[in-house]
Amino acid sequence: MSDAQIRFPPNRLAAAISNASPTAIQACVAQAQANLKAVAGACADHVDHELGVLENNLRGWPERPEDGYLASLYEPSVSLIGAASVAGFPHLDQAARSLCDVIDGLWTNSAWEKDPIAVHVAAMRLLRRPEALG
């Protein structure tokens, strides 16, 4: 047998919350919401930038599979997760998660198909700028 021991450190956050007054918890939640609102613009800029990276990288789709190419699409996709919701685009956040799943599936199965990725990226652009539908 191993000498390894499993330890469960005390959950200090849970203890602090359970000992805090409801007023203190409400103040913390209000501050957290204000902080998210303060970074929403920067998150929207990040979303715009990463969508541009996706669109640009997608235009360079190679004829044959290339090591690292799908990673050049996966990395900006995964960086949209969370940031899109904070920017006020929760559906774009879900689409980014879905795109990561699509890319992962293509990668895992050694498939080389542009269309599923292109459709996701186009849909994500419309989720960011729905007024483009006219």
At which residue positions do the language-model features occur?
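Amphipathic alpha-helix face/heptad-repeat signature
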Residues: 39, 43-50, 69, 76, ...
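Long, amphipathic alpha-helical coiled-coil segments characteristic
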Residues: 25-71
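Short, mixed-charge, low-aromatic patches
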Residues: 3-12, 50-58, 74-81, 100
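Extended, amphipathic alpha-helices with heptad-repeat/coiled-coil or helix-bundle character
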Residues: 68-105
